[in-house]
A protein has these predicted regions:
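Non-catalytic, usually N-terminal nucleic-acid engagement modules in DNA/RNA processing proteins
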Residues: 1-182, 296-299
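C-terminal extensions of enzymes
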Residues: 1-18, 26-32, 41-42, 146-153, ...
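HAD-like aspartate-dependent phosphatase fold
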Residues: 92, 166, 218-220, 356
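Glycine-rich phosphate/ribose-binding loops and adjacent secondary-structure elements
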Residues: 175, 179, 184-305
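Glycine- and acidic
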Residues: 151-155, 159, 216-222, 331-334
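A non-catalytic, amphipathic alpha-helix used as a structural packing/dimerization or gating element
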Residues: 129, 133, 137, 160, ...
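Conserved, mostly hydrophobic/aromatic
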Residues: 24, 57, 92, 134, ...
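Structural signal for hydrophobic packing residues in well-ordered secondary-structure cores
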Residues: 138, 169, 173-176, 180, ...
Length: 376
């Protein structure tokens, strides 16, 4: 993997760059649609490529391990071929999913024992096991196995968890050397900075992570309930210490406003289920503000969904029609809204990149943050 910074903003810490892998170029800053089980909910791969123009999507190790399972993925030739996607893929290690299974998992030094949400069977994820699964999946970027702590989190637990994540990272790195890639191309391992909201722990963790000289680095354990200003504070602290010549990935973030604020702090990559999850509930993000398409006010509004939008659905369908689809509980409505929201998120990061290159990012961001917060 190669990463090149093409321009840094003079007034913020924002960067415009590009990541190059076997599966193509990823222009940064980038937002990555989440395709947990090998699909972005409600969106065809062709729409992701041609309309939304996603350079990279996510898959999830936990979910893909349970279904369709790694033997099927290996027979298919990896996840790229299984889902017919010839662009980049990043896989989460499953650490966050294990965190979310709090009542059905047990964490020990050797790994995590958890109960499948599908059939109740028990499984063990160790750093070594996760690396083997991620080799079978074949993502271009794969995450190290970590423990994601909740918020709030007691200091002592956060410290013990951070050190456990570091030890697990060392085991991930050691095991990867023994398990070569299965599909003929390099896979980059990104370690994950942890430490909850404690600045001293985050500093320890980021220094440890930076010392590994990985292809890129991730910031985990945020956007789990902490105040947004605390998220920004920790993100800035970590970005200031992480190597400048490696991409920085903030995991699980966030709203369109969060996206721009974190770009300004030096983040290059982000992902979140919000654009598709909120779309399925009738919330549309636009440059002028947020639309709840279920509201009665849109019942006879025959204007385009978003006259400034950048996907075909934005001007092809009207607000009144989309509201009707939601009222009738037609799945097409959720699909249209999902395409719109993802298209908006991808436009937002592309435009942020253009503004960074032009030297006008801060002025543009300030206006966008205000406008996008409106309720229409």
């Amino acid at each position: 993997m190669d990463f090149e910074i093409l321009k840094t903003d003079e007034h913020t810490k924002a960067r415009a760059g590009k990541i190059t892998t076997r599966h193509g170029v990823i222009e940064t800053p980038i937002f990555m649609p989440v395709g947990t089980v090998g699909s972005v909910k409600g969106v065809h791969q062709r729409e992701l490529k041609d309309d939304i123009n996603a350079d990279i999507i996510l898959g999830n190790t936990y979910h893909l391990y349970l279904r369709p399972q790694t033997p099927i993925l290996e027979k298919a030739g990896g996840l790229h071929k299984f889902i017919n996607w010839n662009r980049n893929i990043l896989t989460d290690s499953g650490g966050y999913q294990v965190y979310s299974l709090a009542a059905n998992r047990k964490i020990k030094e050797e790994g995590v024992k958890f109960k499948s949400h599908i059939d109740g069977s028990f499984h063990v994820f160790s750093p070594e096991k996760v690396m083997e699964i991620e080799r079978s999946i074949g993502a271009d970027i794969m995450m190290a196995f970590d423990e994601c702590t909740p918020y709030p989190c007691e200091y002592g637990y956060a410290k013990r968890s951070m050190h456990l994540t570091h030890r697990w990272l060392d085991r991930c790195i050691a095991h990867l050397e023994k398990v070569p890639p299965k599909y003929g191309y390099h896979q980059s391992l990104f370690p994950i900075v942890q430490g909850s909201v404690y600045k001293d722990l985050r500093t320890q963790s980021v220094e440890y992570i930076a010392s590994k000289n990985a292809d890129g680095n991730a910031i985990g354990g945020l956007s789990v309930g902490e105040p947004v200003e605390q998220m920004y504070e920790i993100t800035e602290l970590v970005c200031d210490i992480l190597p400048k010549d490696k991409p920085r990935y903030l995991m699980g973030v966030g709203t369109p406003v969060n996206i721009l604020e974190n770009i300004a702090l030096g983040v290059d990559m982000m992902d979140c289920v919000m654009p598709t999850r909120n779309a399925r509930n009738g919330m549309l993000f636009t440059a002028k503000g947020i639309i709840n398409i279920k509201n009665k006010k849109w019942e006879d509004d025959f204007s385009p969904i978003d006259s400034d939008g950048h996907t075909y659905v934005d001007t092809y369908y009207t607000k009144a029609y989309l509201r009707h689809l939601f009222a009738a509980n037609e799945f097409l409505g959720k699909q249209i809204a999902s395409i719109h929201n993802l298209g908006f998120y991808l436009w937002l990061v592309r435009e942020a990149r253009r503004q960074i290159v032009a030297g006008t990012f801060l002025t543009w961001k300030t206006k966008m943050v205000a406008d996008m917060s409106n309720r229409l």
